[in-house]
């Protein structure tokens, strides 16, 4: 398969004996500390969780113990991952399914005993 015209391939590499093209990839830098949440979102505006991060970060820089910032940490993580929201939706879905199964079982039981013979 010849893909030498592909914009991400090089025709000559230091490994010229290898038949496969070399693919470039983008590596996103990972910063530690303040740079980790710079405030810039993917659209160029402020990120959706930046305010939560700033509140949590400020609390951590002024608190005596990390447990003092537990609620702010939970808010920040919920903004990032939506885990509590997904758990709630899952509980609602399971309850709806349970009610549907119970209604169908009740309908089957009622249908078994009522045969009309004319």
Swiss-Prot record:
Residues 98-118 are annotated as: Disordered. A motif (Cx9C motif 1) lies at residues 49-59. Complex I is composed of at least 49 different subunits. This is a component of the iron-sulfur (IP) fragment of the enzyme. Residues 46-87 form the CHCH domain. It is a peripheral membrane protein. It is found in: Mitochondrion; Mitochondrion inner membrane; Mitochondrion intermembrane space. Belongs to the complex I NDUFS5 subunit family. Accessory subunit of the mitochondrial membrane respiratory chain NADH dehydrogenase (Complex I), that is believed not to be involved in catalysis. Complex I functions in the transfer of electrons from NADH to the respiratory chain. The immediate electron acceptor for the enzyme is believed to be ubiquinone. This is NADH dehydrogenase [ubiquinone] iron-sulfur protein 5-A.
